[in-house]
Amino acid sequence: MPARLDRLWQMWSPNKALGMTGVRAAYAIAPADAQEAVGALLRLGSSWPVGAHGVAMLSTWAEPAVQAWVRDSLATLREWKAAQLALCARMGWQTLPSVANYHLAQPMAADFAGLLAGLRAEGIKLRDCASFGLPGQVRMGVLPPASQAALHAAWQRLAGAN
């Protein structure tokens, strides 16, 4: 297997690991013997320009202090995710397994669009997954306890109104 790994390309986009979900920048690590393919890609040009914010993110990504912060934040992120999944269960929302710092949830609501609109009016923004082929589900980023409490409070107000 290790010999096969030498032929793989790696694509890295550290934006989500750094909590910078709106920043669009990535880099690729090519296999050692891929000079011809790398040249062909360079001749194609980038699919979109990387702004100064993306360059800054990629420039700092490999710094020891940044890597230490990412490593040290994993335990906190796991705790927040477990709490958020438990909250979804208490609200009666079904969730799908995920190893990422976001997950999918299906709120049990007769009026899904109305629920999303009501939550948005309360300041809670959930990504409707219909465009992913998953109608009735939302993508939820793992957020801190205060944000989870805000979701729960908004859900209770909306559920009480119906």
Q: What do the predicted segments below correspond to?
A:
Residues G22, V99, G133-G136:
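Short acidic/glycine-enriched loop/turn segments that link adjacent beta-strands
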